[in-house]
Amino acid sequence: MTKDQICALRERAVWKKLSSELSWTEELLTKYADQVDWKELSSNEKVLWTESLLRKFADKLDWEELSTNRSLALQSPDIIRPFALYWHWDDKTKNTAWTPKFVAEMKEHLDWKELYQSASYEDQEFYLKEFFEYVSQLPFNENSWRRSRYFDEYVDAQWKERATEILSHVK
């Protein structure tokens, strides 16, 4: 390697570290946009993530890395919603604290397998009841379904309804 190549390599390494460690703001990113390592920056939880920053640098950001970023700012519906077409939903689904209302709003985008598998038992039951059309498409076997409390409630309700109907025909 030449001296210039070594200097360039070291400079890239410094910017990679700066990109992953500093609490960047939109103002700083505007000033240093050409030096920043955008992949590293996209996974940096210390960045002051705002809708304005995401809009301004949407074409530079690594959205796959950003989707795995656990920054609380990136879990906000106000940040997620406008960029629905950019997120990698398998990762975003895993790395966001979902409320029932926001699940309902973003149901078409969510990775239901990830959402369901990472959910608490209570949330799984809620998803099964409220979003059956999505959950029912997951690759479950018969035993998976039978272990669900909702399955038992459904069987009990249907049994009672049908038993009443059948017995109403007996004279």
Where are these regions (language model features)?
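Alpha-helical scaffold segments
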Residues: M1-K171
